Amino acid sequence: MSDEGYPAEVIEIVGRTGVTGGVTQVKVRILEGRDKGRVIRRNVKGPVRVGDIVILRETEREAREIRRRR
């Protein structure tokens, strides 16, 4: 499966990030592969909602937590 990517289900929308808010930070549960069942935080470009399946190229990297402005 590594040549095509790893499917992951969006379980929570964390927030919007990026200069114009064009990127959404989400928590996903990996559905297949070596890290099956693991929940990680990733940045997703484009429209996304809870329950969507996204294909990740790799499952090692995790996005940094969004910091709130003061």
Swiss-Prot record:
SUPFAM superfamilies: Nucleic acid-binding proteins
Alphabetized GO MF terms: structural constituent of ribosome
GO BP terms, alphabetized: maturation of SSU-rRNA; ribosomal small subunit assembly; translation
Domain of life: Archaea
Keywords: Ribonucleoprotein, Ribosomal protein
A GO CC annotation given for this chain: cytosolic small ribosomal subunit
PANTHER family named in the record: 40S RIBOSOMAL PROTEIN S28, SMALL RIBOSOMAL SUBUNIT PROTEIN ES28
Family from the record: Belongs to the eukaryotic ribosomal protein eS28 family.
Quaternary structure, from the entry: Part of the 30S ribosomal subunit.
HAMAP family: Ribosomal_eS28
Record-given protein name: Small ribosomal subunit protein eS28
